[in-house]
Amino acid sequence: MSQARFIAFSDGSALVNPGGPGGTGYVVLDRARPAYRFGGTRWVEDGPNAVTNNRMELRAVLEALEGLPGGEAVQVISDSRYVVDALSRWIHGWRRKGWRTASGEPVLNRDLIEALDARARDLSVTYTWVRGHDGHAVNEVVDQLAQAAARGVAGPGEAEVVAALRAEAFLAGGPPAPRSSRA
């Protein structure tokens, strides 16, 4: 793991892909305090921006980065190769080619990718891929948050988030209750 001040775990879910409804889940840890926040959002979209798994994955990263102070280092951890590759590798070529893929097609989810690119300019963001459903406790919690948001039901609460952060040694001792929040 990097020594970034913020670690943002994110996941997205589409119950019907494409078409939704979908949900996002995230946990953001501020290692300088230590403090954390977590949440998720239910999404229903149609038309050209219909809910897909990839759109929900991108939205989850946007939600995680929201409100972070500029100039800070952030490590985004995702189980989506699409998110990690799109935002750390492919984006450079897409920009050079006028937002076209190698085959000349328009880049899908350009609106969200450009929004993330703009947000990342104010931060020092690195993207790390982890295998989903492979024992990463915080990744499992954000998956549950995204699934619950997509279904419109309550997801994991603070106790589950704290347990996951402790399991991966991101938190020691008790939870930073005075500074934690649910979005």
Swiss-Prot record:
Its cofactor is Mg(2+). The keyword Nuclease applies. Binds 1 Mg(2+) ion per subunit. May bind a second metal ion at a regulatory site, or after substrate binding. It holds the Pfam family RNase_H. It is found in: Cytoplasm. Its EC number is 3.1.26.4. Mg(2+) 2 binds at D11, D143. Residues 2-151 form the RNase H type-1 domain. GO terms for cellular component: cytoplasm. The keyword Ion transport does not apply. It comes from the Bacteria. GO terms for biological process: DNA replication, removal of RNA primer. Mg(2+) 1 binds at D11, E57, D79. Endonuclease that specifically degrades the RNA of RNA-DNA hybrids. Belongs to the RNase H family. Monomer. This is Ribonuclease H. The gene is rnhA.
